[in-house]
């Protein structure tokens, strides 16, 4: 699979307007080690009624994972059924086809129709697929302050071999070259500012508004 320098409201004091007709769907993507998971955690803490899209996957759950919370765990046959029914906004084969993962369309559309802000975190290909399926979605690219910063973050993890880091950096170059294809670009210099910019995008979720 598994796009903004603008004024942002005070995320700590923001409250969702009950008059919102339709929630805005934000699709977040970016290279490895740019800080997507940390930013997502921040958004889930700041926006109390945020609907975070939970992917469907055919892989087995890990001991600490809960069905419906971390993933929707489904059988390969059920996943194929979802594909055939057009029930996925995007999907991909992971690790050479060892399993499949994808974004369920119905929960996203139901939440947005009910006026909730929706966040989907996917890779570059996934973001393009979601944007094609939902042109009204806002594709957001989370970018590092610099190439050197991204490289330092990857190396600093200390969890990957030099070869794995090299492959991730090669992929990151491709991803960074595609950032102009996104609707908004948020540079993750500081967590607080990046989170605030994304809150601004999510809470501007009034149907027909810019």
Swiss-Prot record:
The keyword Transferase applies. ATP binds at residues 30-37. The keyword Cytoplasm applies. Keywords: ATP-binding, Cytoplasm, Kinase, Nucleotide-binding, Transferase. It is an enzyme of class 2 (transferase). PROSITE patterns: GUANYLATE_KINASE_1, GUANYLATE_KINASE_2. CDD domains: GMPK. Gene3D superfamilies: Guanylate Kinase phosphate binding domain, P-loop containing nucleotide triphosphate hydrolases. It holds the Pfam family Guanylate_kin. Its EC number is 2.7.4.8. It comes from the Bacteria. Residues 23-203 form the Guanylate kinase-like domain. Essential for recycling GMP and indirectly, cGMP. This is Guanylate kinase. It comes from Mycobacterium leprae (strain TN).
